[in-house]
Amino acid sequence: MNKSAAVFKQIKENRLIAILAPKNTAECVGAYEILHPLGITLEIVFRSEIASSGIKAVLDKYPDALILAGTVMTGKLAEHAIEEGVAGVVSADYIPEVLEVCVFHDIMCVPGGLSDVGKQLVRKAELYGCEFEKLKEKYPYQWVYKLFPAVTATNSFFGIAKAWKGPYKGLNVFYTGGLSAENLGDILKSDPDGIFCGSALTKDIDNPEKMEEVAEKWLSIIYSKTN
């Protein structure tokens, strides 16, 4: 099982993905050490150069760590993140050059938005050289898309995710944007395949006990609604 298949399996099992915009590399290692034992996947976002060194620091200490690179908006940045050893790449939109780099390296690519879901799936199949209908079977970790935003101040877009699963059977839809512990229970009614919870789980990175407490609260909500 390659890294992308492994992180995809982890997300499917536990659903929760925590997002960290690190101020230093120690935060990346610390966040991983808190979240990993709980089964929560860590996404380190590329909003500064620290992200790259932070990913490297985690993987230097924990070579088998499954880390996602977030806010990857160029092919060059995707190459860099993959060189550092990430298991998957996440973008805020469908960016063809990012997707192309990911498929070339057989790394999970999770574009996001409220459209383009079909375009990115078709392009993935073309790049892998397989029939569209076989993409889900051969590369299940590429049969994904991120619903962004899932919630705004005035609307929710869960119905779009349900509609996508009509033509794209078994599509794995990960929700992000506007999610909180307060509305998580309602969100779970639409059965998301993964939940990017923003900085909610990492904002207390300087207080490990508090961070773990918040993470466990989110997990308890998920388990209570799905079991």
Locations of regions flagged by a protein language model:
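Hydrophobic secondary-structure block in the mid-to-C-terminal portion of proteins
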Residues: 159-225
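Short amphipathic alpha-helical patches
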Residues: 58, 65, 104-105, 125-126, ...
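Well-formed, non-transmembrane alpha-helical positions, independent of function
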Residues: 34, 57, 80, 101, ...
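A general structural signal for short secondary-structure boundary/capping elements
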Residues: 65-68, 90-93, 113-119, 195-196, ...
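Conserved anion-binding
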Residues: 73-77, 84-184, 200
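Residues at the N-termini of beta-strands
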Residues: 41-42, 88, 144, 194
